[in-house]
Amino acid sequence: MSTELEKGNHMEDVLRYEGTRAVVTGAASGMGAATATILAALGAEVHGLDIRPCGGAVHGSHLVDLSDTDQIDAAVEAIGGPIDSLFNCAGLPTTAPDLAVMLVNFAGHRHLTEAVIPLLSDGAGIAFVSSVAGMGWVANAARNLELVMTPGFDAARTWCEEHPEVIGGMGYSASKEAINAYVAFRGFQLAPSGVRLNSLNPGPTDTPMMPSFIESQGQEFFDNFPKPVGRNARPDEQAWALVLLNSPRNSYTTATSHFADGGFTGGLFTGGIDMALLMPPE
């Protein structure tokens, strides 16, 4: 992390977070914790939501299971408004059951977001952590929008249960595609209000979830995964991208998916990277 943060110095408020109120899910570890730390250093009042207690950077720590809408609603009520930025960083990895992954990564975050929207200040920002695993959302747009337009958490659960061909063995990527589709759909709807929705699609990042990805995909897959910059990302590198996305300075950017993958998708989309080489032989 930057020297300024390590020393605990108060940074110049270039990004205009001083005196604002931010909500961060997954604030106990990984990208969420790094985001909370940066926001606090920038002068924001940070409220963390996690299944574990959040660290010292947060003003308020709320124990929330994102598959439980009652817990989500209670946390939103406790935090109250106005809210200036929402960072949806929590998530389950590929080793978790597919339905649980869909409910936490997509349905729970959607429920939280919709609960927070009425409390948002003018020009507020909402940023989701998606993944390069969700890059195919446009190719599957019809399917993803069908899920996105389900009316609420329970309806999303029913949709997932009725579509095992979509989420079976692919819950993680399906959840990330749904996030990107929701950001595009809802971001477009909310654009006239000034509320901004964007997603960040990280490549491999050294968070506490990485061992779970290695367990499900295999060490060889990640050893061979193309890294144009030569390494995995650090959590704070992804956190800074999220903070930039939600900054009031970023007032014209909405309904879009952004990639923080060290050049991976650039190589993939232009032929410099052949993912077929990573696939196990049939």
Question: Model-found features: residue ranges?
Answer:
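Rossmann-fold cofactor-recognition segment
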Residues: 56-70
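Alpha-helical segment proximal to the catalytic Tyr-Lys
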Residues: 118, 188-189, 251
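Canonical Rossmann dinucleotide-binding motif of NAD(H)/NADP(H)-dependent dehydrogenases/reductases
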Residues: 12-46
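Short C-terminal tail/terminal secondary-structure segment
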Residues: 4-5, 9-14, 254-282
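Short, small/polar-rich loop/turn modules that mediate ligand/substrate recognition or access, typified
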Residues: 191, 196, 253-255
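C-terminal helical subdomain
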Residues: 111, 164, 168-172, 177-180, ...
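Catalytic loop of short-chain dehydrogenase/reductase
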Residues: 93-94, 99, 125-192, 204
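Short, flexible catalytic-loop segment of classical short-chain dehydrogenase/reductase
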Residues: 201-212
